[in-house]
Regions:
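Cysteine-centered metal-binding/redox modules
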Residues: 1-88
């Protein structure tokens, strides 16, 4: 497993945890901050985008991570878990 994939799993696990905790946050901001902290450009790596695999339809309401989609509902937790499980 690549370092970027491991970091993506860590990031999506944190997103799932934040959703379950009921935290309100903007997904694009969170991902940009996470990747900046780890020296990555999330826009250039599909693991860090909602469309993490071009062959898989995005489960997050067809919105790219560059759209400021708010993550706080049960549906969003489920969507984030789908991505997390697919990355594992």
């Amino acid at each position: 497993m690549t370092k970027q994939r491991r970091l993506a799993i860590k990031m999506w696990q944190e997103i799932v945890d934040k959703c379950k905790a009921g935290d309100d946050f903007y997904l694009a901001d969170y991902k940009a901050d996470f990747c900046k902290k780890h020296g990555l450009d999330w826009r250039a790596n599909c693991y860090f985008c909602n469309y993490f695999d071009p062959c898989l339809k995005c489960p997050l309401d067809d919105k790219c991570g560059q759209v400021y989609c708010k993550v706080s509902t049960k549906h969003d937790v489920t969507s984030a878990e789908i991505i997390l499980n697919a990355l594992r």
